Structures are given as structure tokens and as C-alpha cells.
From Swiss-Prot:
Signal peptide bounds: 1-19
Gene Ontology biological process: neuropeptide signaling pathway; positive regulation of transcription by RNA polymerase II
Family per similarity comment: Belongs to the galanin family.
Maturation propeptide residues: 20-30
Xref: InterPro entries: Galanin (IPR008174), Galanin_pre (IPR008175), GMAP (IPR013068)
Positions of modified residues (Phosphoserine): S116, S117
SMART domains: Galanin (SM00071)
Organism listed in the record: Sus scrofa (Pig)
MF terms (GO), sorted A to Z: galanin receptor activity; galanin receptor binding; neuropeptide hormone activity; type 1 galanin receptor binding; type 2 galanin receptor binding; type 3 galanin receptor binding
Keyword Secreted found: yes
Stated role: Endocrine hormone of the central and peripheral nervous systems that binds and activates the G protein-coupled receptors GALR1, GALR2, and GALR3. This small neuropeptide may regulate diverse physiologic functions including contraction of smooth muscle of the gastrointestinal and genitourinary tract, growth hormone and insulin release and adrenal secretion.
Protein's UniProt name: Galanin peptides
Lineage: Eukaryota, Metazoa, Chordata, Craniata, Vertebrata
Length: 123
């Protein structure tokens, strides 16, 4: 009897190992892809606003309301101005570097010469 139990246990272990390696086990449900509902939930309302293939339902409240735009939030306008200033500063610096590389800075009136007193002291 113990020999029969050991043989049964060994055969069950062998069968489970073979079925797992060959893919004969219980099939796992596959994910089929995105549905409109899951994409709208995960990506938010702004991702699907640009692509409207269904009838628009204006005025009806959905499960969630659209959040106010950045300008409508408190402090949003100030934040936009500071971002604009930072972008403008970066653009001016890049334009300066481009002019400096092209050698056009020497031809502009009112600018100091390219070789400053610090550069002359280092030579």
C-alpha cells in the first residue's frame, strides 16, 4: 500500500509538471485590449475630447465632472506667467548663443566687445 501511494504521488507530480511546461494547465483569461470605457477612465476626459466619435451630450453630468482649467484655478494665472518668463528667457539665451556662434554679435551696436577685460587678463 505505501508503495502504491508513493507511485500515485510521483505520477501526480509528474503530470502536473508536464502540464505546466506544455501549457496544458488551466487557461488564463487573456486581456483583449482597450475599451472606450477603460481608456476614458484611465486616460481621463482630456484624452478622448479630441476624438469624438459618439454623439456629444452637452449639459448632462457624467460620473465625474471636468476639472477647471489651469487659468480658473487659484494661482493658475501667476504660474502661467512665470512659465512664460522662463521659456522666454531660455529662448533669448538660445538666440544669443546662435548669434554668438554666427559671429553676428560684433556687428550689433551698443554691445560690449566679445573680448572683455576678464578675457584679456587671462591671456
Amino acid at each position: 500500500m505505501p508503495r502504491g501511494c508513493a507511485l500515485l504521488l510521483a505520477s501526480l507530480l509528474l503530470a502536473s509538471a508536464l502540464s505546466a511546461t506544455l501549457g496544458l494547465g488551466s487557461p488564463v483569461k487573456e486581456k483583449r485590449g482597450w475599451t472606450l470605457n477603460s481608456a476614458g477612465y484611465l486616460l481621463g476626459p482630456h484624452a478622448i475630447d479630441n476624438h469624438r466619435s459618439f454623439h456629444d451630450k452637452y449639459g448632462l453630468a457624467g460620473k465625474r465632472e471636468l476639472e477647471p482649467e489651469d487659468e480658473a484655478r487659484p494661482g493658475g494665472f501667476d504660474r502661467l506667467q512665470s512659465e512664460d518668463k522662463a521659456i522666454r528667457t531660455i529662448m533669448e539665451f538660445l538666440a544669443f548663443l546662435h548669434l554668438k556662434e554666427a559671429g553676428a554679435l560684433g556687428r550689433l551696436p551698443g554691445l560690449p566687445s566679445a573680448a572683455s577685460s576678464e578675457d584679456a587678463g587671462q591671456s
